[in-house]
Amino acid sequence: MKPLFMWAGGKNKMLKKYANYLPEQFDSYIEPFLGGGAMFVWAYKKNPEATFFLNDVNEDIMRIYQSIRNDVGNFLTTLDKYQEDFLPLSKPERKKFYYALRQEHAYNYQKWTATEEAATLYFLMKTGFNGIWQINKNTNGRFGTPSGLLNQKDKVYDYDNVMEWHEALQKCTLISGDFTDCLEYAQPNSFVFLDPPYRGSFTQYGVFFDDTLQLRVIKLLNDLTSAGCHVMMSNRDVGDGFFESRQGDNDLVYFDVTYTAGRRKKNTDGTHSAKKAREILMIGEHNG
């Protein structure tokens, strides 16, 4: 099992760096900022007998997971229809297909069932640009990411992976609300992974995620740690001492990383290259 879609800020590439800090044992797993779910995949493989509580404030993203869990047959029927129409097309025709479908998703989604809407968004995410979530005035405040390379050969999505997710999600409680809503599910020996929008990235689905919200995440980490949970929070170090000054008894670990999806710096000659940055992991271990 692997993440269902590419996701800017996804944790697939960071898992090896995190390996020495992840808990060996936990009874439940809680992820308040689910996104693409790479950390959930790790947790499920680590302990499939655990219970799982997954949240994201983005209702459209959560509808994809809910549809795969509860209505995978109709989800795949809709997805397969798009795939069959899309694959025979030339690249210019695929681009036209993508933008027409994106427009339908933006303005005419009321005609679809919740599952059809979710499958449509999933298709757009699989054919859109680099796992980036954008909204703009031309898409009614809904998914507005440009098309991707559109170079799929024989399939747009991985059927077996969707079915693995269908099975795994049967063990999951899925919610879409504020990230603090997870508190009611936390128990001693829960593993909670906090992956808020990074400092310097400015937005969470078009809403400014400012330092006041970052402080709420740090408070949540401290509260959960005090309750006996294993807690980890990822973020970006922008060099102003923000996390160091609020570290308390928590551990801070630093990682040098290179961003390739949507965070490319412009060179003096006008070209673009991958942007180097420093990420942090704040770790609060329980004492039970």
Label the predicted regions.
Residues 22-28, 187-188:
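Short helix-loop-beta connector
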Residues 48, 170, 247-250:
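Short, structured coil segments at secondary-structure junctions
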Residues 210-288:
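Long, positively charged, glycine-interspersed low-complexity recognition regions
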Residues 27-103, 148:
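SAM cofactor-binding core of SAM-dependent methyltransferases
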Residues 34, 59, 181, 198, ...:
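Short, glycine/acidic-enriched loop or turn micro-motifs at the edges of active sites
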Residues 1-17, 71-193, 197-202:
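SAM-dependent nucleic-acid methyltransferase catalytic core
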Residues 203-207:
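Glycine/threonine-rich flexible loop motifs
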